Amino acid sequence: MFKKHTISLLIIFLLTSAVLAKPIEAHTVSPVNPNAQQTTKAVMNWLAHLPNRTENRVLSGAFGGYSHDTFSMAETDRIRSATGQSPAIYGCDYARGWLETANIEDSIDVSCNSDLMSYWKNGGIPQISLHLANPAFQSGHFKTPITNDQYKKILDSSTAEGKRLNAMLSKIADGLQELENQGVPVLFRPLHEMNGEWFWWGLTSYNQKDNERISLYKQLYKKIYHYMTDTRGLDHLLWVYSPDANRDFKTDFYPGASYVDIVGLDAYFQDAYSINGYDQLTALNKPFAFTEVGPQTANGSLDYSLFINAIKQKYPKTIYFLAWNDEWSPAVNKGASALYHDSWTLNKGEIWNGDSLTPIVE
């Protein structure tokens, strides 16, 4: 009896040891575009694994401005002066949607591309957003509300409104193509803050749900996705979905898992511990980011060191943040150095190890 018991224990021990000794299989997270470039695939997988780390796990980011009008490297210079570090992600907006022009496509400017290419080659990641002009008008009006009937015309390529949208998308795609030709992956964030009532593509009333509007938004998002991905063959984009944290219906506009790589929140706050929407967005099972952040009242009093502490304590799945520039910038608020030097923060120059991304933690 004793001998049999000993043999049984030995078998259990050997089986357990074999299981424990088996290496953990790598879990690959791929972009939604199955034809994504290899570098874009590698960046996506690397980003998705950041929450598994114990440190160096949240990419810092900053908005550099609107191409041609305000974009420059001044924001990264300001942050470096304040902290000794540069943001890992640097953002440009291609669309100056307020601009009154003879042709709506003239509101699109991609002249920030050369700086974004340099930023990538020097260890950073570019992000591009779009404050699109309103195709219901000849130009401008990015904050002018439109009816659902006007929205439908924008989605119809045979109408004047639809042709205006297509003209803008064509010029945007031309700019994105320049970056792809140089092997530069892009965090691409179109149609943000759709659950707010301030952009033409979003809601028209404060926290008033409009199911038809939500459906029209999803159609527009998918139209842009298919144009960029299928028609233009752009395979370097990581698609970012970013509702506003201070409005309801954060996931109602979600176009579906097949169209989004990263989900996030545009969060302007006074209390970093009270940002709404984290649980809703992370429940979509996509990597999560704070796609815009800044003080709700821009008077220089926001302490960004509390923001990174809140990420650690309340929003630990965060893979990056992108702080807005000007008076919202960490450089002119409090705690910038603590934010950029926190053990969780990853800055420009800390993404790559030679020609390879820093190691993934499973």
Give the ranges of each region predicted by the language model.
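Aromatic-lined carbohydrate-recognition surfaces of secreted/lumenal glycan-active proteins
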Residues: A62-F63, R189-L191, Y221-F249, F288-A298, ...
